[in-house]
């Protein structure tokens, strides 16, 4: 069972001020997780968390993370712009993009961001549009499958991201000749792992690669970016990741591989968007309809516009009915109102018998929730609300209005 970070009474009060649906974030929880992460990697003097803006691109959230000592991982012009305007500067910004437009490389250089090259071919392109920086990172893709024990976690060979080992080594050689003085290695080999072993195993592979690359190229390796991949327990029966255990696991591998190779100075970076935010967000929605045909359908005022993951990935998000806990249960599909049959938050889920007007919370929407929203069926994206440490709630993004949807159109006047 998952317990929301707000009570029924708090939610009822919030819905008087903020109409459903809306995303709700927990400031205290965000800060607690950021501090736990920094404590877990305190053994590494240069450790830095670069929060992936794409997970939760809201300035109010990013300001909290800036206050907690985090940098940001960016992948587009607007994400770079947001980082700059919020006060992230220089090495506090990681720019990890692919198929990158020229203007984005130029802007990243203007801001002094650390560029993480996705492709060997990007060297010539980067050189043609802007100057080569003194510090640069390259993204590695080992190919094959990524395994933890007997479990296949992901298939890097099918991923469009990163370079082969041979390409990465050649990239380092050429970039060194072009004047790069400090290098980094980056890799993401699996997504949303719920295992304390993922980061240590990824670290082992990258640390062994680092030793080989330095031996063959003679470059100064300044940092290794473990990227993301540490997930959250979307399902209540899953054991959540323990970041302290994960950090100590990486520490052991660091001492085993990098220190003996004379690389004890290497800084460790992470990009933990999902781990940092997912569990600290809820999608608050109200039951508006109930329908019985071959199945029982619980209709809510949210839709895939507000949370795409179940429709896109078949992802599980736990649902709590805040009005009913001890009632008899029923098996239902929880659905939105889009003209698409995949607009379902839950399929054949056992929930307390639900009635129209009930408040539901959909858990773990703090990352890749609002940010993946869209406007199909001319649906409007919801508000975002921050539950502050002092218990007060603050609107940090208003709900869209019809005028917002129509603002970019020509030849249409909403006032007529």
Say what each PLM segment does:
Residues 131-145:
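Glycine-rich, aromatic-flanked loop segments that form ligand/cofactor-binding clefts
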């Amino acid at each position: 069972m998952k317990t929301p970070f707000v009570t029924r009474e708090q939610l009822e009060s919030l819905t008087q001020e903020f109409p459903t649906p809306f995303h709700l974030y927990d400031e205290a929880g965000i800060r607690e997780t950021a501090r736990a992460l920094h404590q877990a990697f305190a053994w590494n003097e240069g450790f830095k968390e670069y929060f992936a803006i794409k997970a939760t691109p809201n300035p109010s959230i990013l300001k909290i993370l800036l206050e907690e000592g985090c940098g940001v991982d960016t992948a587009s012009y607007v994400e770079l712009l947001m980082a700059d305007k919020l006060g992230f500067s220089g090495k506090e910004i990681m720019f990890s993009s692919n198929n990158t437009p020229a203007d984005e490389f130029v802007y990243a250089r203007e801001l002094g961001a650390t560029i993480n090259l996705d492709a060997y071919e990007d060297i010539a392109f980067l050189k043609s549009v802007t100057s080569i920086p003194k510090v640069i990172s390259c993204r590695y893709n080992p190919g094959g499958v990524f395994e933890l024990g007997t479990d296949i976690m992901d298939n890097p060979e099918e991923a469009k991201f990163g370079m082969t080992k041979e390409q990465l080594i050649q990239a380092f050689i050429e970039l060194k000749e072009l004047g790069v003085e400090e290098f980094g290695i980056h890799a993401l080999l699996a997504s949303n792992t719920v295992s304390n072993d993922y980061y240590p195993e990824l670290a082992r592979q990258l640390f062994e690669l680092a030793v080989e690359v330095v031996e063959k190229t003679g470059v100064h390796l300044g940092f290794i970016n473990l990227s993301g991949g540490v997930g959250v327990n979307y399902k209540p029966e899953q054991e959540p990741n323990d970041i302290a255990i994960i950090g100590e696991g990486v520490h052991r591998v660091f001492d085993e591989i990098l220190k003996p190779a004379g690389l004890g100075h290497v800084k460790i970076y992470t990009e933990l968007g999902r781990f940092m935010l997912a569990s600290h967000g809820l999608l608050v929605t109200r039951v508006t309809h109930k329908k019985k045909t071959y199945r029982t359908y619980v209709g809510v005022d949210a839709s895939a516009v507000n949370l795409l993951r179940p429709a896109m990935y078949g992802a599980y998000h736990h649902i709590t009915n805040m009005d009913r806990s001890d009632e008899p249960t029923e098996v239902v599909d929880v659905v939105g109102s889009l003209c698409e049959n995949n607009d379902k938050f839950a399929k054949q889920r056992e929930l307390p018998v639900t009635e129209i007007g009930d408040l539901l919370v959909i858990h773990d929407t703090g990352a890749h929730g609002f940010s993946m929203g869209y406007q199909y069926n001319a649906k409007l994206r919801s508000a975002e609300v921050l539950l502050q440490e002092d218990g007060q709630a603050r609107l940090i993004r208003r709900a869209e209005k019809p005028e917002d949807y129509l603002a970019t159109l020509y030849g249409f006047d909403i006032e007529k």
